[in-house]
Amino acid sequence: YMRIAPELYLKRLIVGGMERVYELGRVFRNEGIDIKHNPEFTMVEIYQAYADYNDLMHLTETIVSQTAQKVLGTMKITYEGQEIDLTPPWNRMTMIEAVAKYTGQDFSGIKDLGEARKMADAINVPYEKTFGIGKIINACFEEHVEEKLIQPTFITGHPKEISPLAKSSEADPEITDRFEGFIYAREICNGFSELNDPIDQRERFQKQEEDRAA
């Protein structure tokens, strides 16, 4: 009864013909507690038919900025002594661009796992032996980039390896149409164009099981 997300019920409504649905409610995660995570929290989850991740980024920055304007009378707020400007449009960077900007390691075009490991080693990022290139890029991002995203920023272009439910990019099948929003080094949202290819989805789930077994 303690759900981790309202996802399945909202998706059933989309399939049933309701083109825009959302729920604001409590969710529960059987995970540890730290400054960024709590096992019980309030979340809004949104699904929209005939839209993609670009539409959802626009919706997200509009909701956050307009909420601040309505409640506080301004889109500029101060948190922990730092001024945060919520005015749209927010900054946008791909994960690879962000890693390159803040670490100097550019994973663009890297296809060799050994080379990716060397690049992670160069900036002292730990990784497991089962990690593919996508997970290594994400590890570099989490280790060195997240803490630097103070102003509202959307990170896009997540590797397929860490995004099993997101649709692949038409430009690069190893990258997905996904975004995460960050404010003051905190992830405030996660969204993507939903994968609707059942064959691709099954293959990704099978790959996940193989990785767990390894």
Predicted regions and their residues:
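Class II aminoacyl-tRNA synthetase catalytic cores and aaRS-like
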Residues: 1-214
